[in-house]
Amino acid sequence: MNAAVFSPSALSLPISFSKTRSSFLSRKKGVKGEFRVFAVFGDESGLVEKKSQWRPLFDVEDPRSKAPPYKGKFLDVNQAIEVARFDIQYLDWRARQDLLTIMILHDKVVDVLNPLAREYKSIGTVKKELAGLQEELSKAHQQVHISEARVSTALDKLAHMEELVNDRLLPGRVVTELDKPSSSTTASAVELDREKTNTGAKSLNVSGPVPPYSPHLKNFWYPVAFTADLKHDTMVPIECFEQPWVIFRGEDGKPGCVRNTCAHRACPLDLGTVNEGRIQCPYHGWEYSTDGECKKMPSTKLLKVKIKSLPCLEQEGMIWIWPGDEPPAPILPSLQPPSGFLIHAELVMDLPVEHGLLLDNLLDLAHAPFTHTSTFAKGWSVPSLVKFLTPTSGLQGYWDPYPIDMEFKPPCIVLSTIGISKPGKLEGKSTQQCATHLHQLHVCLPSSKNKTRLLYRMSLDFAPILKNLPFMEHLWRHFAEQVLNEDLRLVLGQQERMLNGANIWNLPVAYDKLGVRYRLWRNAVDRGDDKLPFSG
């Protein structure tokens, strides 16, 4: 990669703030550009304190004092990526400040329109104040759109730089290591087995190459896409249990799922188009309905041809398929957030991890203060004891001392509700005792032996204004990717060791209870047991 010279990033324009502390909004022009930015301080009227329920979103340290010291220097690859990542960190903070400004301006408008306040003001004064606030809001919204563009550009830039680095420095490494594992047991695995024998601890055996999927694991309904991602003229290609499928809407608007391979010459159908509820192959124009039947063969006689299709349903904003051979279960599980929550983000990502390993990670919270030190667990203390409290026969419970409820919902779903009144402070509160909450849905669809399609949905029971701000989709995706990246480097390391023979469940302890129960459930499914554990 060519060397680069660092100059103050166009994405991180310097911003001036008023040094005086007041309850009003201070404005100064940035050193560059003609747009205005806003700083918010609050001692007198307590506006910031008034929004304490939103503090988790805005309690982020100003990162500008930690800018990389590379101004005017030639950069190597790692330094260039460090600068790009700093841009992302700065934009994260900047976007939060823009949002807080709009929220406080909105409250000031409400205060001006308050009938009690108007009793002491003339109509002219009220009009003047509203006109001023309207101007402030207009400029603040303009800044939000600028932030949105910056976020998009910064994320694209970082992704491009990381792709270049991977191409230049890491060609084929991951594929070689993960796709061609050694079947022999490593020395470290032998040591772990010896330690297990000495301690007498009970372990699960999860080691070696990922075995073929049990047909019994396929006999469940699997969520594969969000309704919002499947328009009438779009397709969603997926991989499920190492088979390619494509989802699209039929003429009646209902979703269907067919094998993503044309019966004629095996061309991927998702490269084509959807015409009047039929998917058209881009090679010779053959068209298929949602049940897999070929309805059109241009330039030749229509033959009776059908490709494989799967049962496919739509419920509560999600698309589901049944990939198994048994008749589909008559009822789909509900994955809706609890009453009072509003969905703010729905994201889909493909991750290079076996889906069971990813579920192990999501069902474990004890790792948070050690792994997520730069995201949601920043500042968390390490408790002397972490416990997961659950019914004897359940796959759900709550974490002590964390205010978090969690549930594993077969076959591959994790639901969690997190109390976020005071992030970074552990006070032993239960989820119910917290005033504000984050609800998360994680779906870990088994794409292939070393690949997972992750569906993530985030809901809040506060700050509904965030739903309508234009840049929030980028911001939520950035947050989710930050957290996942902290996990992935560890889980990929586990996967490499596992493929080489190490047992990743060699020595479970008390706080591993939910993960162990998932593995016991999974083993019973793979065996084809009539009665599954923790199911009643």
Curated annotation (Swiss-Prot):
UniProt keyword list: 2Fe-2S, Chlorophyll biosynthesis, Chloroplast, Coiled coil, Iron, Iron-sulfur, Membrane, Metal-binding, NADP, Oxidoreductase, Plastid, Thylakoid, Transit peptide
Pfam families linked to this entry: PaO (PF08417), Rieske (PF00355)
Coiled-coil residue windows: 123-150
Topology versus the membrane: Peripheral membrane protein
Ranges for domain Rieske: 221-321
Top-level lineage group: Eukaryota
Major subcellular site: plastid
Reactions accelerated catalytically: chlorophyllide a + 2 NADPH + 2 O2 + 2 H(+) = chlorophyllide b + 2 NADP(+) + 3 H2O
Entry's Gene Ontology molecular function annotations: 2 iron, 2 sulfur cluster binding; chlorophyllide a oxygenase activity; iron ion binding
Subcellular locations according to the entry: Plastid, Chloroplast membrane; Plastid, Chloroplast thylakoid membrane
Induction (free text): By light. Probable feedback regulation.
Binding site for Fe cation: 360, 364, 367, 372
A GO term from the CC aspect: chloroplast
Gene Ontology process terms (BP): chlorophyll biosynthetic process
Main function: Catalyzes a two-step oxygenase reaction involved in the synthesis of chlorophyll b. Acts specifically on the non-esterified chlorophyllide a and not on chlorophyll a.
Protein's name in the database: Chlorophyllide a oxygenase, chloroplastic
Organism for this UniProt entry: Arabidopsis thaliana
